[in-house]
Curated annotation (Swiss-Prot):
It holds the Pfam family DsrE. NCBIfam families: PRK00211.1, sulf_tusC_dsrF. Heterohexamer, formed by a dimer of trimers. The hexameric TusBCD complex contains 2 copies each of TusB, TusC and TusD. The TusBCD complex interacts with TusE. InterPro entries: DsrEFH-like, Sulphur_relay_DsrE/F-like, Sulphur_relay_TusC, Sulphur_relay_TusC/DsrF. The lineage of its organism: Bacteria, Pseudomonadati, Pseudomonadota, Gammaproteobacteria, Enterobacterales. Keywords: Cytoplasm, tRNA processing. This is Protein TusC. One of its GO terms (biological process) is tRNA processing.
Length: 119
């Protein structure tokens, strides 16, 4: 089976991309264990706790990221440069444990995957 990477690069709640990506990730995890999740650019906001999507009439899917461990999804990476650019601290208690990587290391890790799905 091919190695699959899910890349979240959009902010939550502005579009359905984040929710659809999470749904696809969880569904794919039933078919393969060889997958990883990457959070880059505005996608780092997907992992912030305490969001209030009901204020913009959106569904609160962010808490569902906490289920990644139950689905045996353990390879989670977050772009350290994206965090800095957005004024976020890598020590922030995100809703899922993601390992910060600098952009060049993140690119090298991403190159190990056969299929890259971006949301």
């Amino acid at each position: 089976m091919k190695r699959i990477a899910f890349v979240f690069s959009t902010a939550p709640h502005g579009t359905t991309a984040g929710r659809e990506g999470l749904d696809a990730l969880l569904a794919t995890s039933a078919l393969t264990d060889d997958l990883a999740v990457f959070f880059i650019a505005d996608g780092v906001f997907q992992l912030l706790p305490g969001q209030k999507p009901d204020a913009v009439l959106a569904r609160d899917y962010i808490a569902t990221f906490k289920l990644l461990g139950l689905y045996d999804i353990e390879q989670c990476w977050i772009c350290a440069a994206s965090l800095r650019e957005r004024g976020l601290d890598p020590q922030t208690p995100f809703v899922v444990e993601a390992t910060p990587l600098e952009a060049d290391a993140l690119r090298r890790e991403l190159a190990n995957y056969d299929v890259i799905l971006r949301f």
